[in-house]
Structures are given as structure tokens and as C-alpha cells.
């Protein structure tokens, strides 16, 4: 959750393979490329005022590679041999082998409060408002319905270069819909302002109604040159019935969109 949990470094979206110090003010990559040391800013703090220290970084890393977290993290950081706290504000990550991107990938680790998570299971749902390292804290929520975030007035990094022009909303609310049909009807009723549709059937059949007729909702295709997936029917032509091209064409004619 980027609203609540900060990272050691901040990636630059318009500079490939670049990152800037955020919680960490610098890192030093060893000459042999087999370790990297991060140095944490003295003024980096959690939402409760506790300073962020190397033990929090170590705890966050160990938690995310544990069996309680999603396996993707263990795969993502598989080349990390160990993490060692050097002192209160510095931590070293050692590698099994050279990896030209690993020192940047480590910078993406979200930092949790070790004190807050103490005694809690990461694999279970925790219905408490956590201590955050990011710009927002939880103001209110209802399980399965919504969560509302409030900007932390004491956010430590508001004037950091890595946060220039960002996080300008005082309140951000996420509403949860049990399926896309419900979500689309909520959109058509005006509960939110924009929807990105990627389902051809819904696009052809369901985007209609009074607000469309009144031009209060604009249905528009925005063409782009980005890579995108495909939607369609893939016929198994090893089966006799699908080997005839006319049969495949006939099946497509059965759909009115």
C-alpha cells in the first residue's frame, strides 16, 4: 500500500533503472557487487512519531520472505543471501551472486513498524489501524465495503524532493464492489467518475442508460500504442470440428458484439 508504507528508495518513472533516496539518504554498492549498504535518514519517522531504524527494515524484509507472505517476494529477492544490521541507521544486504538490479530492487521493500507488528501474524487479517511510514493513515473502514485514508499532518517526507507535487488529497476513499457488474452500475449511478473497461461484452452491451443519453457520461475509445493483451476465442484445431474455417467463422457470427 503506497499510501501507508514507504520504501528505502523512490523509483523514477521517466528514468529507466534509476532510483533516488527516500527513507534511505544513500546506498553504497560494494566494489565486488556482492553487497549493498543502506543508510537511513535521521528524520524518517512513522506516523506515531517513532523514528525508522535498521531493525524495522530488517523486520520488513524478513516478514516478506517468510511463509506468512506471498511467495512472490521470496522469488523476487531470491538472490539475497542475508541482511545484517550494522547499527541503528544502517543495514547491509549480501548477495549470492552479482545482479545488476538487485540493489535497486531492495530499495522497493515497504517498511513496516516492527513494534506495531510484534506478536501479530502477517498471514491473518488484522482489523487494527497500523502505524504507517507513508503520507496517509487510516481514518475509517468497514470490512468488505470501503476504506478511507486521511493525510497524516505530521508526515515526515512532505518536503522531500521525492514527494514534490505528490499526495495532494486530504481524504482518499476506496470502495469495494463484489463484482464488475455491481461496480459498473455504481459508476452509471454517479458513485465515481471514471472506469476503464477491458471486457468487450460489457463494452458492447452494458454502457447505456439515462446518463449516457444525457451526455453526463462519455463513452470513448482512447487509442494508444502500448502493449496490450488480447481477448478472443482460441480454437483447438486438433479437434476435427474446429478444423473447418467456415465453422470457426460461424461461431463468431453467433455473438452480436
Residue positions per predicted region:
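Aromatic- and charge-enriched surface segment that lines or borders ligand/interaction sites
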Residues: 26-70, 86, 92, 177, ...
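A structural "hinge/loop" feature
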Residues: 1, 20-23, 50, 72-73, ...
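Surface-exposed binding/hinge segments that line
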Residues: 39, 74-117, 135-142
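Extracellular/periplasmic solute-recognition and catalytic clefts
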Residues: 64, 82-84, 139-150, 175-239, ...
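Gly/Pro-rich hinge or "lid" segments in bacterial periplasmic/extracellular proteins
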Residues: 12-15, 106-166, 170-171, 178-182
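Sec-exported extracytoplasmic/periplasmic mature domains
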Residues: 9-13, 45, 62-69, 100, ...
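Alpha-helical secondary-structure segments
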Residues: 53-60, 88-94, 134-135, 166-171, ...
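N-terminal lobe/hinge region of extracytoplasmic solute-binding protein
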Residues: 1-31, 62, 131
